[in-house]
């Protein structure tokens, strides 16, 4: 059953919402504009704040739905696997689906909104602190990549400090490292002083 949930989570995560929204609205391939990314930030550059917010919400739902389904299966006794391991694997699968979508030759987004949503109901206290940090940093910088990288680190350390199960700590560490990996081009631009 866990294997099926992991596959389900990956497939849901793989739905390229940013690509679909821009394609339907403007008949354009978002990968050919801006950063070439299909996530909410690049959608905002091309299609405006409204569609950016819609994309972010959809990207979050791609992780929330599999996680809530997993909770339901655990509650009903349909899933006998370890709770923390099950939730960690389902969360990571949704993130990997978004970042490496099956539908666009495994080229997807950077996974910030999806990562946040994946852990929203799994490590809620850590999520709240991370959300406060992410949006609070907007007072100091408009550069989304900086806020995203700091948020990734915050999620991991707060999960650790709040004493969540070790498997959830491992999962948030993986998510954090994945955020850094997906932002490697942004990091180079930050070092060069050319990131916007």
Predicted features along the sequence, with ranges:
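N-terminal signal-anchor transmembrane alpha helix
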Residues: 1-25
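Hydrophobic alpha-helical transmembrane segments
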Residues: 3-8, 53, 87-92, 127-132, ...
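Nucleotide and nucleotide-moiety/phosphate-recognizing core
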Residues: 5, 51-57, 61-102, 134-135
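Structural signal for membrane-spanning alpha-helices in multi-pass inner-membrane proteins
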Residues: 9, 67-71, 98, 102, ...
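C-terminal ends of transmembrane helices
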Residues: 18-21, 97-107, 134-141, 184-188
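Cytosolic, membrane-interface loops and tails of multi-pass inner-membrane proteins
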Residues: 19-52, 184, 188-196
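Short, non-helical or kinked segments that cap or interrupt transmembrane helices
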Residues: 29-37, 103-116, 143-151
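Interfacial segments of multi-pass membrane proteins
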Residues: 44-48, 70-74, 109-141, 153-162
């Amino acid at each position: 059953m866990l294997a099926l949930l992991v596959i389900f989570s990956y497939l849901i995560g793989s739905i390229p919402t940013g690509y679909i929204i821009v394609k339907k609205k403007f008949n354009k391939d978002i990968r050919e504009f801006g950063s070439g990314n299909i996530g909410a930030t690049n959608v905002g550059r091309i299609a405006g704040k409204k569609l950016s917010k819609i994309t972010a919400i959809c990207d979050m739902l791609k992780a929330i739905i599999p996680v809530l389904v997993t909770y339901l299966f655990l509650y009903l006794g349909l899933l006998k696997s370890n709770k923390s391991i099950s939730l960690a694997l389902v969360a990571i699968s949704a993130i990997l689906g978004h970042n490496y979508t099956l539908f666009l030759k495994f080229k997807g987004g950077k996974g910030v909104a999806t990562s946040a949503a994946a852990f929203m109901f799994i490590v809620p206290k850590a999520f709240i602190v991370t959300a406060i940090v992410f949006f609070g940093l907007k007072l100091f910088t408009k550069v989304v990549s900086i806020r995203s990288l700091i948020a990734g680190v915050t999620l991991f350390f707060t999960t650790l400090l709040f004493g969540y199960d070790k498997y959830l700590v491992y999962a948030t560490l993986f998510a954090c490292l994945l955020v850094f990996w997906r932002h490697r081009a942004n990091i180079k631009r930050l070092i060069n002083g050319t990131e916007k």
